[in-house]
Amino acid sequence: MSREKILAAVAKNKPDLTPLPEIQNFGNPYANLVEQFKAVLTAIGGEVVYVKDWEEIRAYIQTHFGGRRIVTNIDPLADVAQESWIKSDPHSLEDVGLAILKGQFGVAENGSIWVTETEMGQRVTPFIAETLALVIQKSELVPKMHDAYIRIGGERYGFGAFIAGPSKTADIEQSLVLGAHGPKSMLAFLME
């Protein structure tokens, strides 16, 4: 069969488009979204830090990450970053000790934070840094992934990811390795 015949047969057999099913909202099963988010993220190797404002984040970073290469695209934290990096070659980010990015919202069910390429600066940023810090408002937590999908369903973005905890992998001997495919540690700054 020629290529043209195959393509014509495929085009002729194309099913009608059907709309996506409605996503049902199952409500909030958690008594406290913040505590649920913290419990899950902590259980999977992340850390939650409660802060009131950008100044508290700045102080935390200076205390815990002084001397490391830091990148951020969050304007109120620009003074803790060491250089402009957003338009740099992504390979130049290989030695980043801490990347601080803003997340759009968090999911209490699995301790994840939704981040799009707009917040990432470069797509590689949340995956190449030794430590990833994501900043979200406490009020921006949703209970379940169903709620998260409802929230992102109408958005326009080229790339986005739900990021939950540090990178983890285990081999056949069940030896857990953190940081094999991404950051060794992850912080979530939950801001008032």
Per-range role (PLM):
Residues 1-192:
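The feature marks the mature, well-folded catalytic cores of soluble enzymes
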